[in-house]
Amino acid sequence: MQAWYHCENVYPFVPQEVLDRAPSVRASLPNKYCDPKIAADLFEECLDEHLLCDELGVNVVSIEHHSGINSLYGASPMILGILARQTKQVRILSLGTLITVRPDPVRIAEEYATADVISRGRLEIGFVKSGDSEMVSGNANPVGYVERFWEAIDLIQKTLTSHDGPFSWEGKYYTHRHVNIWPPVYQRPHPPMWAATGDPETSAELGRRGMVNALVLRGPEASKRAFDAYREAGLPAPGTDRFAYAVLCYVGDSDEEGLRVGSKTLWFLNTSLKQSPQMSKFLPGRIPAEATAQNYRTAPLPGAEAARRPADGLIGITAEQAIARGILCAGNPDTVYKQIMDIYDKVGGFAHLIFIGRTGFLDHKEAEKGIRLMAKEVLPRLPAETSTPAAEPARAAE
């Protein structure tokens, strides 16, 4: 199994009374509450954690969120460029550039190709539809975003795999009459492609495309439904290399330390998910028409759970509840290993463990200790991945 270190690089230092008054802690919270000197320290610490991962053989993840306390990584291509140059051996996953918010997929493909070349073929590309507040801060139209998501992926893939001169693209959402990026990708035909999603319909489409399906903080039950939909619709006998599971995770010397420090990661759920209704359930086009009426109610009626954001059910949970629901793994190395394997068995296996090892008030020293214990005491015991027979591994350009 491959482990991927995920650091949100959050900004948890806004006074609680400000957060309590704010209708949303994303998109609309004034940036006067973010001290750039503190932000500089956070960037340095988080990037150093990625370099530690490079020493220990733990792959790294670059994420992208905008305009809020939940993450300072608003410019994923810049982080990718830094990691591509500074790391030397591990894989780098972009999870990812928000393609439904960015207006130009060709530019995104160009950024990915450049990072792949700088890293000498260590890039993995992850796509994200984007959250509600991202649509607002990105000045994007949420109507038709699912179709736009798939067309952007198609255009990016064609851009990365075309090497015989310019081509033109006439799509429903994107038009490019001259596409011909330099440099081309280092890996051929293109770097491995992922998508972070949780609904079975999208997972089924990922299965048909042979992409890696990543489930982020969805728990074993929802993840199994998505993975099963992938298996039923996609490649025959897909291996575990097509599945990724992301979980809040902290490994301590003892169960007491692991749980105490790991509980700090729940800040991400309990504080940084707060959004105003106009940036969530009242945002047009984000919810199927048949669920809209129920979604607008103050309290959804029975049977209307599909209209809620998956994140809504995570706000306010305790560490014990999060562990029971497969959202958090915390304890000593033996305990965390057992927790991971319990999730592994429930979902039917996965080859990629994305462990969110730093968020909230969990500090740099604690994060580095957790990374070391994960790399040395837990990762070597996790099962090897199984490969998908029909999958052609990416290779370096000749």
For each feature predicted by the language model, list its residue ranges.
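Glycine-rich anion/phosphate-binding loops
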Residues: 41-42, 100-114, 330-338
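N-terminal beta1-alpha1-beta2 module of alpha/beta enzyme domains
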Residues: 1-93, 191, 393-398
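Acidic (Asp/Glu)-rich catalytic clusters
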Residues: 54-55, 80-89, 112-123, 204-208, ...
